[in-house]
Amino acid sequence: MPAAISRNWPAPAKLNLFLHINGRRADGYHELQTLFQFIDCCDMLDFKVTETPELILHSNMSGVVADSDNLILRAAKSLQQTTGFNGGAEIWLDKRLPMGGGLGGGSSDAATTLVALNKLWHTQLSTEELAKIGLKLGADIPVFIHGFAAFAEGVGERLQAVNPGEPWYLVIAPDAHVSTADVFQDPLLPRDTPKLAIDTLMSQPWANDCQKLVVSKYPQVAKALGWLLEYAPSRMTGTGACVFGEFTQQQQALAALAKLPSEMQGFVAQGMNLSPLITRLSHP
């Protein structure tokens, strides 16, 4: 009897509510302090367990990423190799989040793949073990696996659960591809923000240390942020290009969205301190 398809596994976007760069390590990675929060805008994945070990990915974004580089397939293969599971999976991705942009979509897709297949394959790894697999694939993946809003330190792997407010956001995705590697290699990037205690960071105004550099190099980001600042406290997420404005009421965010210039793309979403992936995990 063929296996049923397990449907509607969410892979939410994240915002970096602040991002501070505290220095550069000997290995070239940067020491960070950042605050991750999920938003209720998600890619969706479906999974079917197969008896043969092949991993097959169907996507509405076919051709964008080579199979060998696709984080979803790499995550599934890593779980196979770690656990010795000898079956496979057929995976369907409904890509709804902007590619790149600092929303973490690729990392979130990989995290959802690890969490879902660990359940469907009955491989029974702990959350910590899944996060270790995820960290090898990308620094942002563990936060999506743990599934709670988090203060992160180090290269982003040391996580502490936090409960910031859950406001409404207007997110704008400028038509620009910002290379994370280029941002972190740029000599003009500030790398000397003092490390602060979490209580201090949570109570002071929030900022993104990458923002000034990216805005200076990408006029589309500068334009989107300039427009958004007319309506709400706003900043960039990650290394961009996406920017977000913070609103207390959904209606305020929707009213601003209605005025968005036609050449800009945006959407309204609510902050979430618990990932919808965790809610989905508790269902059959």
Swiss-Prot record:
Its EC number is 2.7.1.148. The keyword Acetylation does not apply. The keyword Nucleotide-binding applies. It comes from the Bacteria. GO terms for molecular function: 4-(cytidine 5'-diphospho)-2-C-methyl-D-erythritol kinase activity; ATP binding. NCBIfam families: ispE. Catalyzes the phosphorylation of the position 2 hydroxy group of 4-diphosphocytidyl-2C-methyl-D-erythritol. This is 4-diphosphocytidyl-2-C-methyl-D-erythritol kinase.
